[in-house]
Amino acid sequence: MDDQRDLISNHEQLPILGNRPREPERCSRGALYTGVSVLVALLLAGQATTAYFLYQQQGRLDKLTITSQNLQLESLRMKLPKSAKPVSQMRMATPLLMRPMSMDNMLLGPVKNVTKYGNMTQDHVMHLLTRSGPLEYPQLKGTFPENLKHLKNSMDGVNWKIFESWMKQWLLFEMSKNSLEEKKPTEAPPKVLTKCQEEVSHIPAVYPGAFRPKCDENGNYLPLQCHGSTGYCWCVFPNGTEVPHTKSRGRHNCSEPLDMEDLSSGLGVTRQELGQVTL
């Protein structure tokens, strides 16, 4: 009986003894899972932090790149020659032409000379050519030999040779026109009236309500024209065309030089039209 009890008690104690070694194994697995989870969380947090800092640094690098490009463009703009005005500046100044000139502005200062440049076809061509290459068309105000010498000094060798060849051809052409026959005396041609003189000749000296232009001693239009009946005065081009935005009852001064950045180009067209012709 004692032996059976010992066997039964031993048999009942064996499962309990067999279960005890499994508890440390479960604890070690739980700790391993916890450690792996914490490590993964730390790695993800590190990756997120790194991405955030890289995003901030990328924004700063973009700003530095834009600033560097702006500085380079500004440096190039400062190195460009300032003889020719950019077309963009002329277009930005164009809206000033659309604003009517008030009487206060007319009385504050004299109107600058917009009659220095005509509005004929040759004036348009000259203005456009000087804009594209102002150094190729110098100011020639001396005598004919002085102007030729100045041209030779200002032009390069190739262009001067071309110009010299053209002068030779022109000289031969002029020499070939000379005739050995005696020239018959020709009658003096009748005096041709200028446009201003012809217009004045059709209007009596005293004619109320009619506009009678004023001419100088050479028959050209005076820069300042006035209508006595209305009291308005305005500036005109050499061909008598009215300069835009100069008609008022204020004081005028049409003899001062015109600044190219002022109201108009001096050619009877707006700066916007000149920009369109250039493009």
UniProtKB/Swiss-Prot annotation:
Source species of the chain: Mus musculus (Mouse)
MF term (GO), any: cytokine receptor activity
Gene from which this protein is expressed: Cd74
Subunit and interaction comment: Nonamer composed of three alpha/beta/gamma heterotrimers. Interacts with CD44; this complex is essential for the MIF-induced signaling cascade that results in B cell survival.
Disrupted-gene phenotype: Mutants for Long isoform or Short isoform exhibit similar functional capabilities.
S-S bridge residues: C196-C215, C226-C233, C235-C254
Glycosylation, residue list: N113, N119, S265
Function text: Plays a critical role in MHC class II antigen processing by stabilizing peptide-free class II alpha/beta heterodimers in a complex soon after their synthesis and directing transport of the complex from the endoplasmic reticulum to compartments where peptide loading of class II takes place. Enhance also the stimulation of T-cell responses through interaction with CD44.
Induction behaviour: Expression is induced by IFNG and LPS, through CIITA.
Chain positions found as Phosphoserine: S9
Region of interest (Disordered), residue spans: 1-23
Identification of the protein by name: H-2 class II histocompatibility antigen gamma chain
Principal subcellular localisation of the protein: membrane
Membrane topology of this protein: Single-pass type II membrane protein
